[in-house]
A protein has these predicted regions:
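Short amphipathic alpha-helical segments
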Residues: 2-3, 31-34, 88
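A short glycine-rich, Lys/Arg-flanked "PGG" loop and its adjoining helix->strand segment in the class I
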Residues: 2-17
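Conserved class I S-adenosyl-L-methionine
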Residues: 17-50
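A structural motif
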Residues: 43-64
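A C-terminal cap/extension of S-adenosyl-L-methionine-dependent methyltransferases
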Residues: 61-144
Length: 144
């Protein structure tokens, strides 16, 4: 993740920006379990947070694609990790929006987007569990 974000700077004009939108890993369906073939697992929030050996056992028991969902688990990202990568790779945040209800849910479920409460967005680590989507606009950090 850090290597990719750092590499993207080579395509960025001096006044350019990069948009990122992602679900924090710890959100209820951060493991993309909604696409699982098991009706139970596809509706079970947070179970992707189980320790990897337990998670793989559950996937195997329910005849899911263990390798695919384990890879998703291994590449999940939190808000804090993303912000640390942004800082460490020489970018700065221009704008950020945290959502309690992801804008894509308009198309999936007919739900209107709902911004996350400021108090929740301000609490590191806790916000990951209750924020379904974040949007970030980043640019080069001035070094001089």
């Amino acid at each position: 993740q850090e290597k990719l974000i750092a590499w993207m700077k080579s395509f960025l004009t001096p006044d350019g920006v990069i948009f990122f939108g992602f679900p924090p890993w710890q959100m209820p369906f951060g493991g993309h379990q909604q696409v699982m073939t098991s009706k139970l697992l596809s509706k079970l929030p947070y179970f992707h947070l189980l320790p990897m050996p337990v998670y793989k056992s559950v996937l195997k028991l329910f005849k899911q694609d263990v390798a695919a969902f384990a890879e998703i688990k291994e590449t999940g990202i939190s808000i804090e990790r993303f912000e640390k990568i942004v800082h460490n790779t020489g970018y700065k945040v221009v704008n950020k929006t945290h959502y309690f209800l992801n804008p894509i849910y308009t198309y999936k479920f007919g739900w209107k987007p709902l911004h996350q409460l400021g108090i929740i967005s301000a609490i590191p680590h806790v916000r990951n569990y209750f924020t379904t989507c974040v949007y970030y606009l980043i640019t080069r950090r001035n070094t001089g």
